[in-house]
Amino acid sequence: MRIAKTIAGASVALSAAAAGAQLAEPVHVRNLNPLVSIFGLPAWDTVPIGTRFGATAEVANHYRFSLQNNERLRLDGETVRTNFAFTHGFGSGWSLGVEVPYYRVSGGVLDDVIDGWHSAFGMPDGGRNGRPEGELLYAFGDPLEPSFVLTEEQSGIGDTQVKFARLIGRDQGFVVQASIKLPTGDEELLASSGSSDWSVTLLRTRPLLARKRAASYYWGVGVLRAGDPDLIPFDAETWVPTGIIGGSWQVLPEFGLKGQIDVHGAFYESQLEEIGETAIQATLSAWRRMGQRGQIEFAVVEDLNVSTSPDIVLQVAAAWQW
């Protein structure tokens, strides 16, 4: 009888810990603007208990034509980014993690869906209907002679990120993380900047488990030191601030909702708004626990500062912890 009670108590404790961890875990959002995703913007991670493996797939459709003085930018295509992340948490509150993304750049399949959405609700399409659907064209640089042109579908590995994190604070509710991005990816398809970046972030997480329906909030600030990209003709900023604020609500024992806002400064000294202004993205997601060790999450990411990030990003993520 005592053994049964002990097992039941341990199961409840594990379930509560898993719920608290999922509530306090931000959605892993990155700006998939092709000229921004080459940099090492950090994902906002918590320190896991034990080992965690995650896989995230996201798709972003791009359509921007911009000209300012001697700078020109053309983006017409689609990015599918699949990210594999492995993190191990040590008993002392430290964690070590690594992320490796895989990119596929193509004309995509969402053009028709987006055109239909704009037509159905009478929304402006920015000239999308004037371009062939499913076409890939990335070109930027001098208006007369672009220094970079991509017109053929490609795929390849992106830059690897290595992360070190530490829990601090009286309630262990702060996460300090340092990360470095290594130039392991393919620059020719904009999966790499060709240089190393490093960043330092501080994340505050606060699960509120003593409520009728558990909830949480989190916020974070950080800074990234960006290396000079090899193939991009625009002058890059050296220091880029970043931040996050969000929360989660556990609607049912195995199901919850999240909302958050991610922001980062401009990565380029450019008059083009797509790369020379602050980016703000809003995310809504729904997550579900899969047993004691797994979870799956679906998210929609929308740009709040129009043109600085993809109009919409669809994301699905799965994670397992042991």
Where are these regions (language model features)?
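Bacterial N-terminal signal peptides that target proteins for export
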Residues: 1-8
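N-terminal signal peptide c-region/cleavage motif recognized by signal peptidases
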Residues: 13-20
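Transmembrane beta-barrel domains of Gram-negative outer membranes and organellar outer membranes
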Residues: 21-191, 195-227, 232, 238-321
